[in-house]
Amino acid sequence: SGRALQILIRRGYDKYKEFMGGVIYEDPWFAGGHCGFSNTDEVGKPQTPYHKIVEIRQVLAQNGLGDVPIIIAGGVWSLQDWQDYIDNPEIGNVGFQFGTRPMLTEESPISQAWKKLLLHLNLDDVVIQDFSPTGFLSSAIKNSFIMKLFDRKNSEIPFSKEQTSEFSEPIVYSKNTTYYIRKEDMATVDEQHKKGKTCLSVTPDNTLIFLSVDEKMQDMEDIKDCCGCLSACKFSAWSSHTGTTGKLPDLRSFCIRKSLMEVGHKGNILDNILFSGKNAFKFKTDPLFNRGNWPSIKELIDTIKKGL
């Protein structure tokens, strides 16, 4: 937003404005990976970025940076979709960042399995969700890894440590610990047990989630192997400031370092996080990617320069 940019200029660039080479505007609804939603953005209601980009240009001009280019990222597939932004005096110097489309090029280092998956995605196969251990929303492909986390989140139930009229049904948490849940949640317990989800985990929100024995063992192993890659991690409860966030590890999340490392080194594409921009479904109908072979980066750039 323009307000955020003004704060950044004041704090980091006020005395060094000549070093600002450009400002990247990343559309939170269409970009892949972590999403930069503001407090006023509604996740389920995508907005055109035009007015926000004009606001950014106005802030730059007010700070003597009127010629600094704005780089538009997120949802950029072809330049013909952005004609209203090019040679537009309200926006000024502008550039475009392509993040999703180059993934299916000959030079792209992702695995062949990952490339083939991208080629067959539908519009609803990329979802914005809150599973990242960073605490930010992120956009990723809805594979079995993401669906597992959705299942954990959607089946979580409240509990009480004491038996009450509302929380009347006992459920064994461990050898020496019994919790109590509501009668209406017993159906969820039965459903999860039929799926093999017989282990329980307490979340930081004082709810119970269901995991298989193997899933819980793997998550405990991942927490034990935490290397502190984040300043604060929702999954492991690590904090670089105090050693712990003071909360329970949240198994509705995952070890992001492990998952990105695995899939980045030709690991299983179904059991790891696959960040993706919302427009990945366009691969299926883009003639450049339906010739039986992957185009080179040069071919992609030549196509982009034609506006296609």
Where are these regions (language model features)?
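Conserved active-site-proximal phosphate/metal-binding subdomains
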Residues: 20, 28-46, 59-67, 79-81, ...
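Generic structural signal for well-ordered alpha-helices
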Residues: 5-9, 53-57, 82
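Glycine-rich beta-to-alpha transition loops that act as phosphate-gripper elements at the mouths
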Residues: 1-4, 67-81
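Short secondary-structure boundary/capping elements
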Residues: 48-52
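Active-site-facing alpha/beta catalytic cores
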Residues: 1-29
